[in-house]
Design a protein with these regions (language model features):
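Active-site and adjacent substrate-binding regions of carbohydrate-active enzymes
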Residues: 1-193
Length: 193
């Protein structure tokens, strides 16, 4: 039987953790809550997206660094170590179905238009129609929200980029698993990779 069969999970949105006016990071505040979660019988925490800087915390600007308003990478690593020392697994909730408009690949698309090396990373990019944001093109967006352009998982380079980021998170942060946000909308072959 796998460790997650019958496990009790607790979902935390780090961006919503309130340090009660103190100058503590979200990770330090969450670390203080670990003993309480252990008493509740929690086996694993699922941490909402850490890599985003948008208000909903799902449209990533950068898939490599932790959002600085949550705390430092060191503080996050310490949180994971402390959780593990208490027998609590750490799962990252990751949103890789789309990016924010400030993500480097979309910024390149805005700047270079048809000549962008990242044009194929996004779904349904069309330069014949003006979009909602008046960029000179349209694109598919998550729930038709133009701030969240959908990735095109048919693109091999994009898939490799995302898989490499995920491998990096697992090795760098010693996390125990992933929850792929919006995976029902995602290519099944990518999910399996």
């Amino acid at each position: 039987m796998a460790w997650y069969d019958g496990a009790i999970f607790y979902h935390i949105l780090p961006g919503a953790v309130s340090p009660d006016g103190e100058k503590k990071s979200a990770f330090l505040c969450m670390e203080e809550q670990l003993p309480y979660l252990k008493v509740l019988g929690i086996d694993a925490v699922i941490l909402g997206p850490l890599f985003s800087e948008d208000p909903l915390c799902y449209g990533a600007r950068d898939f490599t660094g932790i959002n600085p308003r949550l705390g430092t990478e060191e503080e996050f690593c310490h949180y994971v170590e402390r959780a593990h020392s208490m027998g609590v697994k750490v799962i990252l909730d990751v949103a890789v179905l789309f990016s924010s408009r400030s993500f480097f690949a979309f910024q390149d698309l805005l700047q270079h238009k048809e000549k962008s090396a990242y044009r194929s990373w996004y779904k349904d990019v069309q330069f014949t129609v003006e979009g909602e944001k008046e960029d000179g093109f349209t694109y598919a967006a998550w729930k038709d929200l133009a701030d969240y352009p959908l990735f095109n998982f048919d693109d091999e380079d994009l898939r490799m980029y995302i898989v490499e980021r995920i491998k990096d998170w697992i090795s760098r942060f010693d996390i125990d698993g992933l929850r792929l946000a919006h995976c029902s909308c995602m290519d099944i072959h990518f999910q399996k990779s």
